[in-house]
Curated annotation (Swiss-Prot):
L-aspartate binds at E173, R219, H448, R489. The keyword ATP-binding applies. Residues 197-200 are annotated as: Aspartate. It is an enzyme of class 6 (ligase). It catalyses: tRNA(Asp) + L-aspartate + ATP = L-aspartyl-tRNA(Asp) + AMP + diphosphate. This is Aspartate--tRNA ligase. Belongs to the class-II aminoacyl-tRNA synthetase family. Type 1 subfamily. The keyword Nucleus does not apply. It comes from Shewanella sp. (strain MR-4).
């Protein structure tokens, strides 16, 4: 039905007859000549109909927005005065000779031109219309090209694209599973995979030493701008490669991807340990475009008569951190109060501050409600450590180390945006040397997942002292977003059992949930390592979209619903009976 895409017609086609199909983006009658902007996935082209062909002209006069049509005509150059530099096809137009209305369109329930006026609910309910917008179409086409480039790289490096099951068994990976009831085994359930983690490890045990898959994963978790209940991973696993080799290979892939798709050279990725990232930036995925850093000052404040500072300063699990904001002395009291409320979201009880109005006047040139508790030597050392100057403000977080990191790390990002401090467009890095475990309510939990290998310890040493052990794990971070995370895996049954016990999984539970893995580890398991990238998040960053919903064809809402299909929906009683399931209504609570 077509000879060319609309957006591909150019000056080289002048004098040629073309056949185009697409949608009427806009139609206008100017002095007896009808101009159509015809749109398809590749772009727009202007089609002109004049009264010399009255039959065709009359049909063209009836066209409305979003009619689906076929156009046959002659490509001609536009006069210089009519060249449209804003259009890819702006140097030419098509003189229409034939016109077929393939399908008419009713008035749209949402605007494609002023899409900002459409609610998120509308856009998702009529997603098939929203995707006609050039911006949305370009993102999905960009995504397809990225996916193709990733496949080419991995294929050329000896990786095998192998599918793993979607119906599988629940595993403890940090979020709730989506469960699928079994009709054959009533009362039993499959789980949709949160990742192909165990299957890709089993593939390494099978001898397929380089695996990849671009795969759907499912997590029933609370949603944010960068989360969806179903999402896509670039999943990679290798045998006989160290963490350094995996990082080098995947960095090569990412650098090549940015160069090919955006003509951006990311350069070599710097390395930073988890502890350094948390100390300097309050985050394990720091945005290095932001020059602000947290500075420890607890050692200066142990003896001050101000419990807000001295309490955490003398607590092994406490921290006092200072954050210097250049030019921040201009902040009003209300703005400081707003910052105080902001850190309160992260559990901080308050926010001390120090305005450096004029350092030539010594303490007289400093404004702060806590200044009376600090002597001049302490103040001068804080100023020296933070590198603060006249006109700056220093903000203080004092609490347990976790609260300080989370609250001041978030404030660092907010202040960087508020004061327009971000430098450069792309700042990648690797974060390495993650803790093996974290303690929550007195119990150990895996920082990555239970199959991550510790670094440099025996199973006996790990069980004897699990705290502060370092894992052989690594995250690739770009502009404050985790692009992907991975690790060396445990390939020894004794070590895997030890990790399970540390996590509170008894040997009996481990056998029930992971018996297949523990048995597989007995049969010559090779050392193996891998990494998984969030494809949706990569596309979001590369296209500048504000949400991963804008780079997915049919995403869910933030409440994990689909307005287009009205999913999730109720199952009919016969289906439930076949599955042996009865629905229990939630009891009504008394007011």
């Amino acid at each position: 039905m077509r000879s060319h895409y609309c957006g591909d017609v150019n000056k080289s086609h002048v004098g040629q007859e073309v056949t185009l199909v697409g949608w009427v983006n806009r139609s206008r009658d100017l002095g007896g000549v009808v101009f159509l902007d015809l749109r398809d996935r590749e772009g727009l082209v202007q089609v002109v109909y004049d009264p010399d062909l009255p039959e065709v002209f009359n049909v063209a006069s009836t066209l409305r927005a979003e009619f689906c049509v076929q156009v046959k005509g002659l490509v001609r150059a536009r006069p210089n005065s009519q060249v449209n530099a804003q259009m890819k096809t702006g140097e030419i137009e098509v003189l229409g000779k034939e016109l077929t209305i393939i399908n008419s369109s009713e008035p749209l329930p949402l605007s494609l031109d002023n899409y900002q006026n459409n609610s998120e609910e509308q856009r998702l309910k009529y997603r098939y219309l929203d995707l006609r917008r050039p911006e949305m179409a370009q993102r999905l086409m960009f995504r397809a090209k990225v996916t193709s480039a990733v496949r080419r790289f991995l294929d050329s490096n000896g990786f095998l694209d192998i599918e793993t099951p979607i119906l599988t068994k629940a595993t403890p990976e940090g979020a709730r599973d989506y469960l699928v009831p079994s009709r054959t085994y009533k009362g039993q359930f499959f789980a949709l995979p949160q990742s192909p983690q165990l299957f890709k490890q089993l593939l390494m045990m099978s001898g397929f030493d380089r695996y990849y898959q671009i795969v759907k994963c499912f997590r029933d978790e609370d949603l944010r701008a960068d989360r969806q209940p179903e999402f896509t991973q670039i999943d990679i696993e290798t045998s006989f490669m160290t963490s350094e080799q995996v990082m080098a290979k995947t960095e090569e892939m990412m650098r090549g991807l940015f160069l090919e798709m955006l003509n951006v050279d990311l350069g070599e990725f710097p390395r930073m340990t988890y502890n350094e990232a948390m100390r300097r930036f309050g985050s394990d995925k720091p945005d290095l475009r932001n020059p602000l850093e947290l500075v420890d000052v607890a050692d200066l404040l142990k003896e001050v008569e101000f419990a807000v500072f001295s309490g955490p300063a003398n607590d092994e699990e406490g921290r006092v951190a200072a954050l210097r904001i250049p030019g921040g002395a201009s902040l009003s009291r209300k703005q400081i109060d707003d910052y105080t409320k902001f850190v309160g979201i992260y559990g901080a009880k308050g926010l001390a501050w120090m305005k450096l109005n004029d350092l030539t006047q010594g303490l007289e040139g400093i404004q702060s409600p806590v200044l009376k508790f600090l002597n001049e030597d302490i103040v001068n050392e804080i100023i020296s450590r933070t590198g603060a100057q006249t006109g700056d403000i220093i903000l203080f977080g004092a609490d347990n180390a976790t609260v300080v990191a989370e609250s001041m790390g978030a404030l660092r990002l907010k202040a960087g945006e508020d004061f327009n401090l971000l430098e450069g467009q792309w700042r990648p890095l690797w974060v390495v040397d993650f803790p093996m475990f974290e303690k929550i309510n007195g119990s150990f939990h895996a920082v990555h997942h239970p199959f991550t290998a510790p670094r440099g310890v025996t199973p006996q040493e790990l069980e004897a002292n699990p705290a502060n052990r370092v894992s052989d794990a690594y995250d690739m971070v770009l502009n404050g977003c985790e692009l992907g995370g991975g690790s060396v895996r445990i390939h020894n049954q004794e070590m895997q059992s030890a990790v399970f016990r540390i996590l509170g999984i008894t040997d009996e539970e481990a056998k029930e949930k992971f018996g297949f893995l523990l048995e597989a580890l007995r049969y010559g398991t090779p050392p193996h390592a891998g990494l998984a990238f969030g494809l949706d998040r990569i596309i979001m960053l590369m296209t500048g979209a504000s949400s991963i919903r804008d780079v997915m064809a049919f995403p869910k809402t933030t409440t994990a619903a689909c307005p287009l299909t009205n999913a999730p929906g109720f199952a009919n009683p016969q289906q439930l009976a076949e599955l042996g399931i009865s629905v229990v209504k939630a009891a009504k609570t008394e007011d």
